[in-house]
């Protein structure tokens, strides 16, 4: 796209009148040099641009570029012959008239690394042949397919030449918010991407502003050489007023670019005004490097080879931070070294080699972020080198070389043209203000640029040294404090006083020596020292709190175990309060004595919370143990009482027996609960309380007491369901009617009594209680069921399972067994009547006396026999008087049975030891009758 041309600005008044030296012409094939130069450059090759014939008095100066890995070569468009200009009476600055259109179409570029919408190129405006301007060749933006905004009014340089430059960032590091307004004043508000940014970097008072004014036609303030003081403060910006070469023979007179160039004049480095404060130097240099396409490094020839003089230290810091902050953006920049006051003794090629070597070493020494450890300088920057003679001693040569240098910024066909598409940040100009402000904010927030001054370094060293000495004193005091704490019990106020005194002595020791150094360093080191001291004292403090907690817990346990007239609940509450108060009082004393109540190192809140948690756990455990003890004791007391009531009621079974049993159960249960809580009422069970613990614990305890009571009831029913229990109660009921009369007098059966009728009646009465022994049912017909769920019955779906004692099948089996036992009693009664009829005749007693008279007299006459008779008679009398015949008979029978068993065992042993084959046959006595067998069994 062909850019519109404009008139050349006037030469600044400071420039002495000198004839322009034309730039060497190009051959016809030079129209392709822009593209071919990309591919021909190598990292070590220095390129020279054409220069005017040098005077005899000075050597020819060269300029070189050391581009690094170049981007893919951009195919150059076919050269297009410019159309003949259309005659026009005056240069026109207004928009292109409708009738004036270019006769050729815009050339379509092949290389488009960034996709943008193409914009039709405006028609070329006719210019008078006598006008001293040249036609600009397509800008890099055009060759890179970057659209440019179509300007509504083309301004000549004179239309904004009087506008002063803008202070982009002031000396206080504040970004100017009026940047967009300035762009509008200099007619760049619609430039879009058709603009370029150039910045200058160098030491103070080295002629940076002078170089920019001469090179770009700007009007930056320059130094008053009689005063030699700082002129540029902060970062200033102005629009360049570029001119074409003045020589009519210049081959570039028709190929100059009209792209808007913004020039940033950066405050010089190493100025006496800022002294050791290099913060702004670093940040301004980094800002210039990050936002500009071309960074001009203004350096005197005698500074080359120096480290500080050539700003190598500053460049190292800037490169390192730039790599960390902006490496991901993958932007490239051109660093152009302009060597001032070049006298020619050292060729430019040698100076360039020295600078490239220094830059390479500098790049290798920086700390690179992860993933870029092997990155090279050439991956991010291209280098160019040029030299200028002394401005005051050789003014004509100086301005001639400046004019040649300007071709690199104005003529895209120049082999060393600087505004390559790869350098552009691709930020439209209407958004550049926001972009630059964000870059500045990011630089401002980066701490890597806040490097200390020598004064701060000294302050840091001395403050650290003093703090280390004070810390040694503190550590010696800390050992004594720890020994005293581990030696045994120590008063909290005493321990806190020792800790507070150690802290104060340490801080005073530091303060007495370090307070005269830089306040910020002094305060920062003091803060670190206090944090270290508080951290170490905090460990001792926490150890003491742990000891206090153990003491409080031991005191709690001792108070509970000690005998007291108080109830368990009252004793538990008193012990908890005493343990809590013991910890709080001592913790407050030691904290107050230290004198740091707001420090997080001396807070007992966490330990207090841990103590309260452990006290809660202990209270719950002790309460559970006490509740279990109360429930167990209540259950034992209830079990013994209820067992007696249960048996007593079942001994007199009738239709209301279970009503009486249930009433006894409830009475005993309520009495047992009232032993624990005298205020308990069955109508308000929720009011029950153990006197300690939570209401939930009391409710669960009451339920457990009721469950234990019903479990006892269930155990009694299970005991009742046993076979011997049922048969015993049926048999007792049968005997009560069969053997005793209505007055409870034993019945002596005589011959002729109706034993059969009495037997049938008694058996019937005994069987009548069988239903009562089979189901626990009230007289109303309702079965007895527990009022609380029992653990054994949780999986039982039958609600009446608790009341069932005997199943119908078991009832039938037990009735049959009972009848057999009743029949045995019936036979016994029958035999007693037979024995009463079979008595000894009276004459037998007479015969016994007559026949035994001699034996009787022998006994009476013998003292031994007589004494034996008296003893036997006395023993019989005593046994009879004490009613011991039964026990004696039982004992005798037992002894006989034991003797019989032993005899049988011995006999069996003898038989087992008999020879094999020998058999013994035992036969029943012949002639034994059935009655004899039955009588023997009876």
Swiss-Prot record:
Compartmental location: Endoplasmic reticulum membrane
Q: Which stretches are tagged as biased composition: Pro residues?
A: 74-94
Q: Residue limits of the GB1/RHD3-type G domain?
A: 192-423
Do you know which SUPFAM superfamilies this protein is assigned to?
A: P-loop containing nucleoside triphosphate hydrolases
The segment annotated Disordered runs over 1-159, 911-938
Please tell me where GTP binds in this chain. Answer: 202-209
Task: Please note every region of biased composition (Basic and acidic residues).
Answer: 100-118, 918-938
The residue ranges flagged as biased composition, category Polar residues, are 146-158
Q: Which GO terms describe its cellular component?
A: endoplasmic reticulum; endoplasmic reticulum membrane
What's a single GO MF annotation on this record?
GTP binding
Entry-linked CDD domains: GBP (cd01851)
The protein's UniProt keywords, in alphabetical order, are: Coiled coil, Endoplasmic reticulum, GTP-binding, Hydrolase, Membrane, Nucleotide-binding, Transmembrane, Transmembrane helix
State if DNA damage is listed as a keyword: no
Q: Which residues lie on this side of the membrane: Cytoplasmic?
A: 1-839, 885-938
| Key word Nucleotide-binding present | yes
Q: Could you mention a single GO BP entry for this protein?
A: endoplasmic reticulum membrane fusion
Coiled-coil regions listed? 603-630
User: Which regions of this chain are Lumenal-facing, per the record's topological domains?
Assistant: 861-863
EC assignment: the record states 3.6.5.-
Quote the HAMAP family the UniProt record gives. Answer: Sey1
- Tell me which family the UniProt entry assigns to this protein: Belongs to the TRAFAC class dynamin-like GTPase superfamily. GB1/RHD3 GTPase family. RHD3 subfamily.
Q: What does this protein do?
A: Cooperates with the reticulon proteins and tubule-shaping DP1 family proteins to generate and maintain the structure of the tubular endoplasmic reticulum network. Has GTPase activity, which is required for its function in ER organization.
* Record-given protein name: Protein SEY1
Q: Which organism is it from?
A: Yarrowia lipolytica (strain CLIB 122 / E 150) (Yeast)
Gene from which this protein is expressed: SEY1
């Amino acid at each position: 796209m062909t850019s519109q041309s404009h008139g050349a600005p006037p030469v600044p008044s400071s420039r002495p009148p000198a004839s322009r030296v034309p730039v060497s012409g190009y051959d016809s094939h030079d129209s392709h040099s822009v593209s071919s130069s990309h591919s021909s450059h190598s990292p070590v090759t220095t390129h020279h641009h054409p220069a005017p014939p040098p005077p005899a008095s000075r050597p020819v100066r060269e300029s070189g570029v050391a581009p690094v890995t170049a981007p893919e070569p951009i195919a150059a468009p076919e050269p297009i012959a410019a159309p003949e200009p259309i005659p026009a009476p005056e240069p026109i600055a207004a928009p292109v008239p409708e009738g004036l259109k270019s006769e050729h179409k815009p050339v379509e570029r092949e290389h488009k690394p960034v996709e943008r919408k193409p914009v039709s190129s405006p028609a070329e405006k006719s210019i008078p042949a006598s006008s001293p301007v040249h036609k600009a060749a397509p800008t890099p933006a055009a060759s890179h397919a970057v659209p440019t905004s179509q300007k509504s009014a083309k301004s000549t340089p004179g239309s904004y030449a009087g506008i002063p430059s803008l202070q982009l960032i002031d000396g206080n590091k504040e970004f100017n918010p009026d940047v967009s307004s300035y762009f509008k004043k200099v007619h760049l508000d619609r430039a879009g991407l058709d603009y370029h940014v150039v910045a200058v970097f160098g030491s103070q008072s080295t002629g940076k502003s002078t170089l920019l004014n001469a090179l770009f036609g700007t009007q930056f303030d320059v130094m008053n050489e009689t005063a030699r003081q700082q002129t540029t403060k902060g970062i200033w910006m102005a629009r360049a007023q570029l001119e074409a070469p003045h020589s009519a023979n210049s081959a570039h007179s028709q190929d100059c670019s009209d792209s808007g160039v913004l020039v940033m004049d950066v405050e010089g480095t190493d100025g006496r005004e800022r002294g050791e404060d290099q913060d702004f130097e670093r940040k301004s240099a980094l800002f210039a490097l990050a936002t500009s396409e071309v960074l001009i490094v203004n350096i005197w020839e005698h500074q080359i080879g120096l480290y500080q003089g050539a700003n190598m230290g500053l460049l190292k810091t800037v490169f390192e931070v730039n790599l960390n902050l902006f490496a991901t953006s993958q932007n490239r920049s051109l660093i152009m070294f302009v060597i001032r006051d070049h006298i020619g003794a050292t060729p430019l090629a040698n100076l360039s080699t020295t600078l490239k070597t220094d830059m390479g070493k500098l790049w290798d020494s920086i700390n690179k972020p992860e993933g870029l450890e092997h990155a090279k300088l050439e991956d991010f920057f291209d280098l160019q080198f040029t030299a200028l003679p002394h401005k005051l001693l050789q003014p004509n040569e100086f301005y001639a070389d400046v004019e040649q240098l300007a071709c690199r910024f104005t003529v895209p066909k120049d082999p060393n043209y600087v505004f390559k598409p790869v350098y552009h940040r691709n930020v439209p100009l209407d958004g550049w203000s926001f972009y630059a402000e964000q870059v500045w904010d990011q630089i401002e927030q980066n701490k890597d640029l806040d490097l200390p001054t020598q004064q701060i370094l000294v302050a840091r060293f001395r403050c650290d040294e003093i703090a280390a000495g004070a810390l040694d004193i503190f550590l010696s005091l800390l050992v004594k404090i720890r020994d005293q704490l581990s030696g045994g019990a120590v008063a909290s106020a005493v321990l806190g006083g020792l800790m507070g005194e150690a802290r104060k002595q340490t801080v005073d020791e530091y303060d007495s020596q370090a307070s005269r150094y830089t306040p910020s360093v002094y305060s920062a080191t003091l803060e670190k020292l206090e944090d270290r001291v508080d951290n170490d004292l905090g460990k001792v403090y926490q150890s003491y709190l742990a000891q206090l907690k153990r003491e409080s817990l031991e005191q709690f346990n001792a108070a509970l175990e000690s005998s007291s007239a108080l109830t368990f609940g009252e004793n538990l509450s008193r012990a908890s309060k005493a343990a809590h108060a013991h910890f709080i009082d001592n913790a407050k004393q030691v904290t107050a004595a230290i004198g740091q109540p707001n420090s997080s190192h001396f807070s007992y809140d966490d330990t207090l919370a841990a103590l309260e948690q452990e006290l809660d756990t202990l209270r719950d455990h002790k309460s559970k143990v006490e509740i279990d003890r109360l429930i167990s004791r209540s259950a034992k007391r209830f079990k013994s009482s209820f067992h007696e009531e249960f048996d007593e009621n079942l001994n007199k079974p009738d239709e209301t027996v279970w009503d009486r049993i249930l009433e006894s159960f409830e009475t005993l249960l309520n009495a047992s609960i009232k032993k624990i809580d005298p205020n308990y009422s069955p109508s308000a069970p929720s009011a029950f309380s153990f006197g300690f613990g939570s209401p939930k614990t009391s409710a669960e305890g009451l339920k457990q007491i009721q469950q234990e009571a019903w479990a006892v009831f269930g155990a009694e029913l299970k005991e009742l369901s046993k076979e011997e229990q049922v048969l015993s109660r049926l048999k007792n009921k049968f005997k009560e009617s069969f053997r005793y009369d209505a007055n409870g007098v034993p019945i002596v059966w005589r011959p002729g009594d109706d034993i059969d009728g009495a037997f049938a009646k008694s058996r019937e009465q005994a069987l009548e209680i069988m239903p009562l022994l089979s189901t626990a049912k009230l007289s109303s017909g309702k079965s007895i069921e527990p009022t609380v769920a029992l653990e054994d019955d949780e999986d039982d779906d039958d609600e009446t399972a608790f009341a069932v004692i005997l199943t119908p099948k078991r009832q039938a089996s037990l009735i049959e067994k009972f009848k057999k036992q009743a029949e045995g009693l019936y036979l016994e009664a029958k035999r007693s009547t037979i024995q009463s009829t079979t008595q000894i005749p009276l004459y037998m007693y007479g015969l016994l006396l007559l026949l035994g008279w001699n034996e009787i007299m022998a006994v009476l006459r013998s003292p031994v026999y007589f004494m034996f008779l008296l003893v036997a008679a006395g023993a019989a009398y005593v046994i009879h008087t004490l009613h011991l015949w039964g026990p004696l008979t039982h004992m005798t029978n037992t002894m006989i049975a034991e003797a019989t068993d032993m005899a049988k065992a011995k006999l069996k042993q003898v038989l087992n030891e008999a020879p094999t084959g020998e058999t013994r046959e035992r036969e029943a006595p012949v002639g034994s009758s059935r009655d004899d067998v039955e009588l023997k069994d009876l």
